[in-house]
Amino acid sequence: MRVNELSDTYLSENPLVRIFSRMKVNIAVRLAELKKGDLILDFGCGAGWLKDNLRKRGLNVIGYDIVEEQSDIKDYTKIKPDKIFAMDVFEHISKDEVKEIIDNFKKMNKEFELITAIPTENWVSKKCRKILGKSEKVKGHITPLKEILKILKSELKLVKKINFLSVSWIGKFKNI
């Protein structure tokens, strides 16, 4: 079993997939407006592509993933991050778990910012996946964008959103 299929997008042999994935992350990083003193949590860090790239920029990043070998810490709730990245994470978990995670984030630091990317899974997204030789329906996606946004907008303040090439929704939220 593969530990993290998402890292394949950042390192894909297909240059279009690689470029798309890296552009999406770069947009999210710019949206975050990171500063040297920030403590950053890469929530759902997977193989660590984002975490490693932010560390190369001299930033203080802690990665957390449900796969213990990929995490820097066992319990993400024990830190007080200024910025939290959840890139392509929430669609893989239930609505109740998304709500619980947001509640945890709010307890960790009252002034955190959340930067997230969520696939739209619209018809454009499905056709792009088909062109790339993949299934139109993504295996492992449990909660759709609409439901995730409903939770996020009820718990946090949306600061800015970007509809990236119609296939990914990128947003920055602040605690209210």
What are these regions (language model features)?
Residues 93-94, 108-110:
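Helix-to-beta-strand junctions that scaffold the AdoMet/dcAdoMet cofactor pocket
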